[in-house]
Amino acid sequence: MKFLFDLFPIILFFAAFKLWGIFTATAVAIAATLAQVAWVAFRHRKVDTMLWVSLGVIVVFGGATLVLHDEKFIQWKPTVLYWLFAVGLVAARYAFGKNLIEKMMGKQLTLPEPVWDKLNLAWAAFFAALGVTNLYVVRNFTESQWVNFKLFGTTGAIIVFVILQSLWLAKYLKGE
């Protein structure tokens, strides 16, 4: 259910794009992300840092898209967000000694420290690669193809990555 909730702004962006175009879709994505943060704050009294970062990036890049009437800003937004996540994971681990993946998943999984480190680096590399892939699609495909990639390609890549990660982690979870 959380996965669908996380996709909420992307799905609305996709639908609005198909109906009204990139600028309305951008406004819808900003509003949907604001609503998402408000709902989480109301329901849980605490909003995860990743969601705050997502809100900040969509407001800045979406706002620039709307104010300057230039779709390139919203197209760059996923790359900037993914790269911020990648840098955040690496910086938290090596500059501050905190493994954010372990912090997010540590209550559900018991893993040796080196495995947590590999998992953290794998997610950082994955986010970095998603950012590069987004740029490639922005530069080499149409706006409509980019929107399709944003929903289906990125979501598919995340699902495949999580499945592969689960298969890799299975050998460490035999006793659980």
From Swiss-Prot:
Keyword Transmembrane helix applies: yes
Name the UniProt record assigns to this protein: Inner membrane-spanning protein YciB
Function: Plays a role in cell envelope biogenesis, maintenance of cell envelope integrity and membrane homeostasis.
GO cellular component: plasma membrane
Membrane topology (UniProt): Multi-pass membrane protein
Top-rank lineage group of the source organism: Bacteria
The entry's keywords: Cell inner membrane, Cell membrane, Membrane, Transmembrane, Transmembrane helix
Subcellular location: Cell inner membrane
Membrane-spanning segments: 3-23, 49-69, 72-92, 118-138, 149-169
Sequence similarity: Belongs to the YciB family.
UniProt cross-references to PANTHER family, sorted A to Z: INNER MEMBRANE-SPANNING PROTEIN YCIB (PTHR36917:SF1), INTRACELLULAR SEPTATION PROTEIN A-RELATED (PTHR36917)
Keyword Endoplasmic reticulum: no
